[in-house]
Amino acid sequence: MDIPRGNRYRPRKMGDINMHSAFENEHIHGARRFVSEHQFFVGELPQRVTVRLYQSLDRDWIEFEQSHFINTPLQIDAYRTSTPFGDDEDDALHLAVGFCLVQWYQQAVAEGHQPDESWLVPNPRFHNFVERPCSVRS
């Protein structure tokens, strides 16, 4: 059977194992694998921020998602990067934390603005994966 050419998943070798052959289909695109989750506070802001990293399965980069964007008094709107990915995990995490959040916070504080919880704007596309309580049988 011939598979039509086009935009389709091309598996990457991770070690000696071909990853995710289930995605080898012309109708599948944008496949990614969860890598890690990081939670932290920015300066004096009371909300916990979460950053998740994903390995793209058809591109050579690490994607990131943020639970919040930052919108200080120095900005017209909350900063949303147009390139939410890095070359590797370290690069992606530095971009998500340092460039997309902390630099804006530091600049506003340096210019005399008092941190306010309204500076962190929830990302409506970020899903919280809440753990369901487990019942314990005795």
Listing of model-derived features with the role each one plays in the protein:
Residues 34-68:
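Amphipathic, interaction-prone secondary-structure segments
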Residues 46-48, 77-79, 120:
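Short, mixed charged/polar active-site loops
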Residues 67-95:
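A short, exposed loop/beta-hairpin motif centered on an aromatic-Gly-Thr core
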Residues 98-115:
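Short arginine-rich
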